[in-house]
């Protein structure tokens, strides 16, 4: 039996055909299909462009046979910033695409992909000074030296010793 296919339409009007089980890695899509049955029309994905949706669906296809995560998995996954090798390579994209993937994973309710995106960002920050973080993310420092000193004093407890 041939696998069931769905058509998803990105916010830039491009149709992407995808196996149903791949699309159902998104809880948003899975719940929608459970409520509505088999769609005869393309499923609009209004918040995601074609290139980002294609990238997200590539991740979903690679992870299509992963078991659903349990609450226990969530706890242990939250405590580590380790990322599997395939996922690390998958996340080697420019910053704009990385943030678009994170936003799409959040919108489409794909928690494992959202976790990997956030861990990738956490690893970009880990061990860096505020100045290095600003440089990495092109953030303008709008604090006066006095405000910076006050923030450092208030957050002394959080510094590595």
From Swiss-Prot:
Assigned keywords, A-Z: Ubl conjugation pathway
Any single biological process term in GO: negative regulation of cytoplasmic translation
Taxonomy, superkingdom: Eukaryota
Keyword Signal: no
Pathway per the UniProt entry: Protein modification; protein ubiquitination
S-S bridge residues: none
InterPro entries membership: SKP1 (IPR016897), SKP1-like (IPR001232), SKP1-like_dim_sf (IPR036296), SKP1/BTB/POZ_sf (IPR011333), Skp1_comp_dimer (IPR016072), Skp1_comp_POZ (IPR016073)
GO molecular function: cullin family protein binding; DNA replication origin binding; ubiquitin protein ligase activity
Renumbered residue ranges of the record's region Interaction with the F-box domain of F-box proteins: 102-161
UniProt keyword tRNA processing, yes or no: no
Function: Essential component of the SCF (SKP1-CUL1-F-box protein) E3 ubiquitin ligase complexes, which mediate the ubiquitination and subsequent proteasomal degradation of target proteins. Controls sulfur metabolite repression, probably by mediating the inactivation or degradation of the metR transcription factor.
Complex formation: Component of the SCF (SKP1-CUL1-F-box protein) E3 ubiquitin ligase complexes.
Name this protein carries in UniProt: E3 ubiquitin ligase complex SCF subunit sconC
Originating organism: Emericella nidulans (strain FGSC A4 / ATCC 38163 / CBS 112.46 / NRRL 194 / M139) (Aspergillus nidulans)
Gene behind the chain: sconC
């Amino acid at each position: 039996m041939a696998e069931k296919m769905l058509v998803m339409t990105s916010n830039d009007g491009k149709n992407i055909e995808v196996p149903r089980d791949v699309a159902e890695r998104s809880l948003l899509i899975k719940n929608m299909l459970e409520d509505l049955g088999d769609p005869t029309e393309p499923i609009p994905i209004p918040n995601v462009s074609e290139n980002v949706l294609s990238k997200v669906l590539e991740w979903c296809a690679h992870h299509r046979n992963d078991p659903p995560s349990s609450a226990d998995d969530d706890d242990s996954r939250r405590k580590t910033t380790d990322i599997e090798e395939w996922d690390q390579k998958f996340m080697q994209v420019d910053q704009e695409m990385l943030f678009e993937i994170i936003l799409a994973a959040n919108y489409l309710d794909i928690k494992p992909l959202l976790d990997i995106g956030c861990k990738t960002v956490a690893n970009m920050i880990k061990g860096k000074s505020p100045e290095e973080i600003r440089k990495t993310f092109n953030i303008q420092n709008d604090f006066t030296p006095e405000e910076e000193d006050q923030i450092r004093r208030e957050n002394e407890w959080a510094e590595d010793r």
